[in-house]
Amino acid sequence: MTESAIHDRKISLDVRHSDLSGSRLVDVSLAAASFENVTMAGASMLDANLSGLSIVNANLTGMTFDDVNLSSATFENVNMAGASVRDANLSGLSIEDARIDGMTINGITVSDMIELWHANRKGAGNAQA
């Protein structure tokens, strides 16, 4: 294994079929970089600006988001079975066409909340008649 160091330079790299395990990038700009067929299991990112990042066909099992701003983010065709969201600001969050079996908010089953909402709505309609 050869070790190299690059300091204070602007360069473009085309790295293919390589093992860069254990590499360390500090104060580096990877703007517009492209990663294809990359294994980053166990990698960590601290103080990262990932605005505009697109992740497609990825396995994020066991991933942790901590102190992350996901405002204006879009999640499509996502499997979040067994995931947890804690201490989060979900103001204005929209969930559409989602399977919610067993989903809870503060310990209350969401399907029960929706059922109760529908029942109250019907009751309110009958009261006005």
PLM regions: where:
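Tandem repeat scaffolds
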Residues: 1-119, 124-126
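Charge-dense polyanion-binding interfaces
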Residues: 129
